């Protein structure tokens, strides 16, 4: 009989503790110091980051955060906490939250599970599509924490779930619900967070996963390539990133006859700055100024029932298939 107690750690990227320049600067500093995210020579990157980028970007980004901040805190944190609560209720086992950068730390999440007697921990990074910049960074944080620990807990880490049937079903359901509320647009654009093209050239499988997710979503919705497509958002710096860029794609859709657009970001498990501000507001402005007539932003899955069911299914499969 297996007497081991299992716990679940949900992991997301992280968020500033407040919509202030100081808090944003601290968060971005930690995030952009990670070599998984920016692998530029440290002697070049660190002076550039601290001398130019952070002093300029932190105040600007803080204002953007202020525009989406919720009563209980950052949207990413609020929705992540709701996911933890819902998954814990569904599984009837301990579930904790950890962020790769900022609070709550991955370390504190694991310690919370250990204090509850968990000797087996399933780590679920909430990144459907694998990337060195996200999922691998979670692994790094865990390895760092246990670098000097003589006995490691029994870990199971979920690699990705880009083609999980319940994930695709949940995405499709969110699109259909939007159609019921707002009417069906001429086109569905799946906008994924971008990464440098160089990372993919060097073996990152992120783009392949994004393409497969889009393909499966199209099949689930019964849409043709004329009715659904994909692009990449949030480019940072001058280096070439995965294309087509969302900002450029939005400029050419209306001239092609697509006047009503539904936009969704399958790579984000929770709404955050990149969806609530960039995708919902900035991208809408680009599309409308380029001749668009109707722009519908479809929220992330957040704590949607099907999304929680998917998480529970992933966790359960790891427990009962041992």
Curated annotation (Swiss-Prot):
InterPro entries: Ferrochelatase, Ferrochelatase_AS, Ferrochelatase_C, Ferrochelatase_N. Catalyzes the ferrous insertion into protoporphyrin IX. GO terms for cellular component: cytoplasm. PROSITE patterns: FERROCHELATASE. It is found in: Cytoplasm. GO terms for biological process: heme biosynthetic process. Fe cation binds at residues 193, 274. It holds the Pfam family Ferrochelatase. One of its GO terms (molecular function) is ferrochelatase activity. Keywords: Cytoplasm, Heme biosynthesis, Iron, Lyase, Metal-binding, Porphyrin biosynthesis. Belongs to the ferrochelatase family. Pathway: Porphyrin-containing compound metabolism; protoheme biosynthesis; protoheme from protoporphyrin-IX: step 1/1. This is Ferrochelatase. It comes from Aliivibrio fischeri (strain MJ11) (Vibrio fischeri). It comes from the Bacteria. The keyword Lyase applies. Signal peptide: none annotated. CDD domains: Ferrochelatase_C, Ferrochelatase_N. Its EC number is 4.98.1.1. It catalyses: heme b + 2 H(+) = protoporphyrin IX + Fe(2+). Its main location: cytoplasm.
């Amino acid at each position: 009989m297996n007497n081991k107690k299992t716990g679940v750690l949900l992991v997301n990227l992280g968020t500033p503790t407040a919509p202030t320049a100081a808090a944003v600067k601290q968060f971005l500093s930690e995030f952009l110091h990670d070599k998984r995210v920016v692998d530029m020579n440290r002697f070049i990157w660190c002076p550039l980051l601290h001398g130019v980028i952070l002093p300029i970007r932190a105040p600007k980004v803080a204002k953007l955060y202020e525009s989406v901040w919720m009563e209980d805190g950052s949207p990413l944190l609020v929705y992540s906490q709701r996911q933890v609560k819902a998954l814990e209720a569904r599984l009837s086992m301990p579930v904790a939250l950890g962020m790769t950068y900022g609070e709550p730390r991955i370390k504190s999440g694991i310690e919370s599970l250990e204090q509850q007697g968990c000797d087996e921990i399933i780590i679920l990074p909430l990144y459907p599509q694998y990337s060195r910049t996200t999922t691998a960074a979670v692994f790094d944080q865990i390895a760092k924490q246990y670098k000097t620990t003589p006995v490691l807990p029994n870990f199971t880490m979920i690699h990705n779930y880009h083609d999980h049937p319940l994930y695709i079903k949940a995405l499709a359901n969110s699109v259909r619900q939007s159609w019921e509320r707002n009417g069906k647009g001429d086109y569905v654009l799946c906008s994924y967070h971008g990464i440098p093209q160089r990372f993919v050239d060097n073996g990152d499988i992120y783009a392949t996963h994004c393409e497969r997710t889009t393909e499966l979503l199209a099949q689930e919705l019964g849409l043709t390539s004329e009715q659904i497509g994909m692009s990449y958002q949030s480019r940072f710096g001058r280096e070439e990133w995965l294309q087509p860029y969302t900002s450029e794609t939005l400029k050419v859709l209306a001239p092609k006859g697509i006047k009503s657009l539904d936009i969704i970001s399958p790579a984000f498990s929770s709404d955050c700055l990149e969806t609530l501000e960039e995708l919902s507001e900035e991208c809408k402005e680009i599309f409308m100024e380029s001749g668009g007539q109707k722009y519908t932003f479809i929220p992330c899955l957040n704590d949607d029932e099907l999304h929680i069911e998917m998480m529970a299914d992933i966790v359960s499969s790891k427990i009962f298939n041992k």
